[in-house]
């Protein structure tokens, strides 16, 4: 029975899309990682709690098949902000979020990052390079 559970999870992982714009935050990538951890021995893995495993699979399968989207249809395909799906994907991409973090940094934090290298020895040389040399 563990072999059929493993195959069902593998099939679900194959069908679940991976969004490359959400590096490190994508549900599809996380799902693949968790299945690999849970079924380390592949089809020979012994499942400690088969009922919980089956419930988890059924929940993920409902999400993947858009069960709730069809059960609770929306009258319009807009959000409260009026943005489209593509605009949300752009805003929530990892690159855009990194840009927002950079924009929200204060001047002091930007200066610290610019002049403070990782090692303590490097701090002195970075400040020495940043200070103007006296004219002789």
From Swiss-Prot:
GO terms for cellular component: mitochondrial inner membrane; mitochondrial intermembrane space; mitochondrial matrix; mitochondrial nucleoid; mitochondrion; nuclear body. Its main location: mitochondrion. Residues 1-13 form a transit peptide. It is found in: Mitochondrion matrix, Mitochondrion nucleoid; Mitochondrion; Mitochondrion intermembrane space; Mitochondrion matrix. Residues 114-136 are annotated as: Disordered. One of its GO terms (biological process) is regulation of skeletal muscle cell differentiation. Keywords: Membrane, Mitochondrion, Mitochondrion inner membrane, Mitochondrion nucleoid, Transit peptide. Required for the assembly of the ubiquinol-cytochrome c reductase complex (mitochondrial respiratory chain complex III or cytochrome b-c1 complex). Plays a role in the modulation of respiratory chain activities such as oxygen consumption and ATP production and via its modulation of the respiratory chain activity can regulate skeletal muscle differentiation and insulin secretion by pancreatic beta-cells. Involved in cytochrome b translation and/or stability. Interacts with UQCC1. Forms a complex, named COMB/coordinator of mitochondrial CYTB biogenesis, composed of UQCC1, UQCC2, UQCC4, UQCC5 and UQCC6; stabilizes nascent cytochrome b/MT-CYB and promotes its membrane insertion. Forms a complex, named COMB/coordinator of mitochondrial CYTB biogenesis, composed of UQCC1, UQCC2, UQCC4, UQCC5 and UQCC6; stabilizes nascent cytochrome b/MT-CYB and promotes its membrane insertion. Forms a complex, named COMA, composed of UQCC1, UQCC2 and UQCC4; activates MT-CYB translation. This is Ubiquinol-cytochrome c reductase complex assembly factor 2. The lineage of its organism: Eukaryota, Metazoa, Chordata, Craniata, Vertebrata.
């Amino acid at each position: 029975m563990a072999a059929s559970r493993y195959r069902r999870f593998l099939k679900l992982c194959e069908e679940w899309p991976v969004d490359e714009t959400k590096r490190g935050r994508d549900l599809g990538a996380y799902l693949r990682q968790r299945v690999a951890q849970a079924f380390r021995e592949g089809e020979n893995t012994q499942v400690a709690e088969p009922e919980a495993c089956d419930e988890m699979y059924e929940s993920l399968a409902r999400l993947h098949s858009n069960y709730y989207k069809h059960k609770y249809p929306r009258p319009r395909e807009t959000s409260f902000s009026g943005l489209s799906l593509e605009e949300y994907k752009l805003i929530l991409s990892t690159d855009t979020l990194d840009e927002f973090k950079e924009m929200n940094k204060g001047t002091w934090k930007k200066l610290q990052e610019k002049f403070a290298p990782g090692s303590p020895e490097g701090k002195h040389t970075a400040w020495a390079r940043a200070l103007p040399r006296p004219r002789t």
